[in-house]
Amino acid sequence: MASWNHKHIIDLAAFSLEDYQNVLELANRFKALPKSGARKLPALQGRFIAILFFEPSTRTRTSFEIAAKRLSADVQTFSASTSSLTKGETPLDTALTYVAMGADTLVIRHSSSGVPEQIAKSLEKAGKKTAILNGGDGLHSHPSQALLDLFTLVNFFEPSKPDIKSIKGKRIAIVGDILHSRVARSNLWSLTGCGADVILCGPKSLLPNDFVDFVSSPPPGQLIDPIKNRGKVMISRSLKETLQQSDAVITLRLQKERMNQNLLTNLGSYHREYGISRRILQNFRKEIPVLHPGPVNRGIEISSELLDDQSICLTQEQVKNGIPIRMALLYLLMASK
């Protein structure tokens, strides 16, 4: 395996093709472990991982816990509701508390964009060597979700020998509430970075026309994009036209908790225009896999019938793949230190 040069994982804007390949190859090895009878590895024995989620989570939090334990790390999960946050403590001071207790890595989720990066910079300024892994921040980024989505797609397209090259030239649709989705932003970096074209599909209120500018230039402070030839990003308002052109579709939850205005007429009309069902998919000759980062609003983004058909709706496969992907990220961040 080639070298790994990231001290933290805040987003995927600085990921190279080599980085994506490293993560997916390692995740593939970790995924195969149970077949060999091994449930745990001593790779991170004696290391301390603190999971600091200042926002509710089921899949991400639990899979990080399982991933850390399968690598034999010591794990402590922070509970915001019973912490000193209720007394006015800041997320930075909470993080510093865990660093003082010896945490080697902090996995951080927060409802405000930029919090994991701010904590990483503060720790570096203080001379701390603790790694920060972003578990999702505001509307900004959710790198581990995008990587497990990529891993799921690669395994679908090339199940016998998964390879990052299998995604190149594919057209992947992202449908739904893109405006409020940190997952969509991270998926844009990973999919276009690996050579896929992306079609963004949704109502104008949830998908502004200028969203395609998101990956047109590196973010502030990053002068060079490590990917020379990214895939294209397009916008569509028609689900039917989008699916006709797509090799796979990632549909997104309507994030009502982040909507501060009336952006939709009603949920019924949204489902009729942008909801995905078995009936809609039957109109196309090729098999189109359906992904969703969860949690799913049944009958809104995906029909119940389709959601329960795991031969084509890969939501449970995504959940399974979250563990080896997060094992890979923790290992890459910590094994060389």
From Swiss-Prot:
Belongs to the aspartate/ornithine carbamoyltransferase superfamily. ATCase family. One of its GO terms (molecular function) is aspartate carbamoyltransferase activity. Keywords: Pyrimidine biosynthesis, Transferase. It comes from Prochlorococcus marinus (strain MIT 9211). Carbamoyl phosphate binds at R59, T60, R109, H142, Q145, G294, P295. Heterododecamer (2C3:3R2) of six catalytic PyrB chains organized as two trimers (C3), and six regulatory PyrI chains organized as three dimers (R2). GO terms for cellular component: cytosol. GO terms for biological process: 'de novo' pyrimidine nucleobase biosynthetic process; 'de novo' UMP biosynthetic process; amino acid metabolic process. Catalyzes the condensation of carbamoyl phosphate and aspartate to form carbamoyl aspartate and inorganic phosphate, the committed step in the de novo pyrimidine nucleotide biosynthesis pathway. The lineage of its organism: Bacteria, Bacillati, Cyanobacteriota, Cyanophyceae, Synechococcales. This is Aspartate carbamoyltransferase catalytic subunit. Signal peptide: none annotated. It holds the Pfam family OTCace. It catalyses: carbamoyl phosphate + L-aspartate = N-carbamoyl-L-aspartate + phosphate + H(+). Its EC number is 2.1.3.2. L-aspartate binds at K87, R182, R253. PROSITE patterns: CARBAMOYLTRANSFERASE (PS00097). The keyword Ligase does not apply. Pathway: Pyrimidine metabolism; UMP biosynthesis via de novo pathway; (S)-dihydroorotate from bicarbonate: step 2/3. It comes from the Bacteria. SUPFAM superfamilies: Aspartate/ornithine carbamoyltransferase.
